[in-house]
Swiss-Prot record:
Remarks, miscellaneous: In eukaryotes there are cytoplasmic, mitochondrial and chloroplastic isozymes.
Record lineage: Eukaryota, Metazoa, Ecdysozoa, Nematoda, Chromadorea
An example Gene Ontology molecular-function term: L-aspartate:2-oxoglutarate aminotransferase activity
Biological-process GO terms, alphabetical: 2-oxoglutarate metabolic process; aspartate biosynthetic process; aspartate metabolic process; glutamate metabolic process; positive regulation of glutamate metabolic process
Pfam family, one: Aminotran_1_2
Species name: Caenorhabditis elegans
Protein name as catalogued: Aspartate aminotransferase, cytoplasmic
GO cellular component, one term: cytoplasm
Amino acid sequence: MSFFDGIPVAPPIEVFHKNKMYLDETAPVKVNLTIGAYRTEEGQPWVLPVVHETEVEIANDTSLNHEYLPVLGHEGFRKAATELVLGAESPAIKEERSFGVQCLSGTGALRAGAEFLASVCNMKTVYVSNPTWGNHKLVFKKAGFTTVADYTFWDYDNKRVHIEKFLSDLESAPEKSVIILHGCAHNPTGMDPTQEQWKLVAEVIKRKNLFTFFDIAYQGFASGDPAADAWAIRYFVDQGMEMVVSQSFAKNFGLYNERVGNLTVVVNNPAVIAGFQSQMSLVIRANWSNPPAHGARIVHKVLTTPARREQWNQSIQAMSSRIKQMRAALLRHLMDLGTPGTWDHIIQQIGMFSYTGLTSAQVDHLIANHKVFLLRDGRINICGLNTKNVEYVAKAIDETVRAVKSNI
């Protein structure tokens, strides 16, 4: 007999399960388009040169130690991260009504923000986009939200943002509902609202007294321009809207396993900040208590040293540019093959992911017959493509959509 008898086996986390399937595959030709991480033209992880140089500098700095950071995190990092997403000239910064909280990457920021809203502010209803990142619903359910609902985001027939239903669903949301918005490079679709559409979304959220929770995991990585990628967030701030923003530095700094994140908070009344920070400290104390220093030190040094920041800008532009080239190459090969269906959405999307429109049956066929590994909803990581495998992937998709029919 065990205290743990009868515990059911949970289904595997798909993205990591598919990644393991790829690693275990013994076929001589295989392609991994699953896990959300950047890869070079050679298919390898990339340590940004500026990150490596900064790590060496930190390692040689004998003034540093391993004492605990404050509960809310590395002060310089928090300030730099908040300025990165809001802009140094943001009214929220100038009026001292914003601040950052260091968290364990984007997931930790989502969890801390969600738990705070549920336990301190008694917000229990959240809306996430349909489709959305696979972890959003789980995080908010575990944080204490009792209603986790969807708003329409994707037009599956026309492969575009379904702005009409998006706005209609927001209109129907109860007052004080939390609305999760992807700041840029929507995961999994890779398609963002236009600036005019963002303005419509902001108008409804403000008028209906809904609460905005932005999740921005790809700032700078999406377009190569950190300011452009944060446009929607800065517009909402300019409209006088309160919000929290989950930031991740996994993709744009390549610091996946350092778990570097920030929760930027924007309020309308600076007088509430002391209470907010004190209650947030209790939320974090009961979770990870104190955040790790290494990744935060790297990001802080890079963002606050002009020469290093310029190096970082060049790196994110290089990553963004390679992704765009691979999108164009995949589309070109599909067009050359005369692949049935419409595929222009591949180059209309941004960031590392493409929501291909492939069905689950077609995904199973691609994996079984071509050893091209991707998620069941048809999401592919464009970073997994390179000049050596993109034609193979296009031919695999072409054979698959001819063999396994759908309405693409």
